[in-house]
Amino acid sequence: FKPQIAYFAAIGAEKQLENICAHIRSNYPTIPIILDAKRGDIGDTAKMYAQEAFDRYGAHAVTVNPYMGGDTIEPYLVHKNGAAIVLCRTSNAGSGEFQSQMIGDEPLYKHVARRAAHEWAKHGDVSLVVGATYPEELAEVRAIVGDMPLLVPGVGAQGGDPEAVVKNGANSQRTGLIVNSSRAILYADTSDPMSAAVAVARKTRDTLNLYR
């Protein structure tokens, strides 16, 4: 379950998000809650964002932006209840503007992957965001990080290919992927949204499992 916090905060519905997360924890305790916040700030501010994600909302993990450096990631990793999912090679069309810039002989997203795997992971639970819309880069990141979990958005409305995601992103155990489809499920059919969402979610799951 991956709620995007901005959609709740924009209309003053943070309490509703608290209630939804509490419902998930109580009734579906095996389902992880990932707070999609993409936070990126330093020191004490990052500690407060970690407190918000893990103590207020009870999330198991939160998406974070590494642009300001590793000290902005650590507060999430050392929090007793938390894990950080670091933006690496994101699914949006403009992601290459910075993420593909060469630093030495490698693009920036590879540097982020190496730092996450070899440095930040020493301090706690860390994983990476790598978009389904860039399957070749997904394979490159997997080669760098080993069996680390990857959050993979972009299957569904953004056009990511499930077969390519599994082929390029699965780890040595043929797992290690948290594949995210949002709009394709949420807006599957306005006439019967609940049934349509269930059908699309199951179809997406079954398609991914087909290629494992």
Residue positions per predicted region:
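Conserved anion-binding
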Residues: 41-129, 147
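Glycine-rich, proline-tolerant flexible connector loops at the mouths of alpha/beta enzymes
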Residues: 2-15
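A general structural detector for well-ordered alpha-helical segments in enzyme core domains, enriched
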Residues: 16-20, 49, 53, 112, ...
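Hydrophobic faces of well-ordered beta-strands that scaffold small-molecule active sites
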Residues: 1-3, 33-35, 62-64, 84-88, ...
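A C-terminal functional module that forms or caps the active site or interfaces directly
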Residues: 132-180, 184
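Surface-exposed amphipathic alpha-helices with a cationic face
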Residues: 21-27, 77-78, 117-121, 141-145, ...
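C-terminal helical cap(s) of enzyme catalytic domains, especially alpha/beta-barrels
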Residues: 164-172, 176, 187-212
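Alpha-helix-loop-beta-strand connector modules within alpha/beta enzyme cores
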Residues: 14-35, 145, 150
